[in-house]
Amino acid sequence: MMGWNTVERNWKELKGKLKETWGDMTDDELDVIAGKREQLVGKIQTKYEIAREEAERQVNAFAHDCDAAKEPLKNVGEAVSSRQKSVKKRSLYT
């Protein structure tokens, strides 16, 4: 599962997805938040006038969705890496 540290490290790449999820967020607000989970939760809570628990739930769902989207790519990467190792082994024996 993608931890929040991974979301934070990939913040710039995820900005588009963040804006899709929370359309009222500005680029400037997202730049200030810069991947800090508690700041994102607080901003969602105040901007959308929702309970903190709901903001937490939304942020957790976002991280989970990012995780689910990256999982197939991870599997493809592992398959490619495995295939490359297999090809290298065969070329050593030919």
From Swiss-Prot:
Q: Which domain of life is it from?
A: Bacteria
- Annotated region (Disordered), positions in chain: 74-94
Q: Where in the sequence does UniProt note compositional bias of the Basic residues kind?
A: 85-94
User: Record's Pfam families?
Assistant: CsbD
Task: Spell out where the chain crosses the membrane.
Answer: none
Q: Which family does it belong to?
A: Belongs to the UPF0337 (CsbD) family.
Protein name per its UniProtKB record: UPF0337 protein NE2439
- What organism is recorded for this protein? Nitrosomonas europaea (strain ATCC 19718 / CIP 103999 / KCTC 2705 / NBRC 14298)
